[in-house]
Amino acid sequence: TKLKTTSDEVLDYIPTRNVYFPVDSAKVIANGTVKAKDADKIVKQLDINLKGNALNKSQLMVLDILATNNWERPIYFGIGMGPDSYMGFEKYFQLEGAAYRVVPIETNPENYYDYGRIDSDILYDNVMNKFEWGNIKDPKVNIDYFHDNTIAVMKYRYTFLRLAETLAQEGKNEQAIAALDKSLEEIPLYQVPADNSLLNYIPLYYNLGETEKANALAKELAVNNYQTLKYIHSLAPEDVQRGDIMQDEKLSMNVIRFLLAYITQAGQTELAQEISNMVESIYNPTAVHPYRPEVQKKIDTSGSQS
């Protein structure tokens, strides 16, 4: 459709925001796009609501590929792309490792990190057997900021977590443990330091009976966040107000709280006390901090607290 502007410029115009792509259920089962056991989940069509007021060439290309492919070949979106690049197809994603496959099964992800339904057999085989992880775990290889950031963007650790959670829900505990172990083996902490994306590994390890692994990871995260808090409390007040420092402090405190909750629930009281003591060493009211008087209790001249 053509649209003529007030300046007599002729533009291509799509007179709708809603587009759909028909689904031949028999075909997608026959060619393996959807497993027979999931036949009842197949939708009649993909319904997409286009956002914004214009489509660029790459977006038109995506729509054209989906329309003309007619479920003949697999179509994927890269996992590291931003939500705006997914054009509304994310509710039809299936996470298969480093990419999302478009499948005619609708899910409703709550956030960016939950995009893509999981077929545990496919994802497990990909990340455990088919993928080659290269030399990330080789101590001789330098993982600089660029590589570290790329690994974070690609959400590999979170992919392993989601796989393990799905396997645990399906009662496949040994495979769930293997998936978590594989994550820490291929993306080891000595190469790619622990970050807060590993937080949910801990309760899962506990629930799977891997207490020692959960404790080790909990302590690693606790030390990391303790060091962040200790650094922040070494700053002058005017520096604390700059940038995202106060937000970083809040985040680290929240992580510590979650860790203590997980550890206590698992009955690991000694570790919980050890972590509490680390944090208390920063906020201890008897160790008056020159720049943070608001966190101190009043201390009289005799040394007793009031």
Predicted regions span which residues?
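ER/secretory pathway lumenal C-terminal domains and tails of membrane proteins involved
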Residues: 1-306
